Amino acid sequence: MDIGTISSRYAKALFSLAKDKGQESRVYDDMKMLADSFSMEPELRGALSNPIVSVPEKVKLLTAAGGIEVCELYTRFINLVLAHKRETLLPFIAYIYIHLYRKEKKIT
């Protein structure tokens, strides 16, 4: 499967769950923070792809990256992605989630 397809499926699943729980705006803020973190901190990608860095350490990095308190749904999602060894897809998932949210809310 290609990166776009996999990333899109994860982003759509997260958006659907967040919407069902009424947390799509909160998750949007967290995903925006994640996307911004990847843009501002290029080393973040390297740390995520480093097999020496443990999953709990990667979760800490991704939840503390933007300096804001993240919601539980975001943290659970990050754990799921890392458990399936899809951390390299996180930037793409974040951008797709942001696009889905903006499309839904008619934000240009």
Sequence positions of predicted segments:
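Elongated, mostly alpha-helical coiled-coil "stalk/stator" tethers of large membrane protein machines
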Residues: 1-108
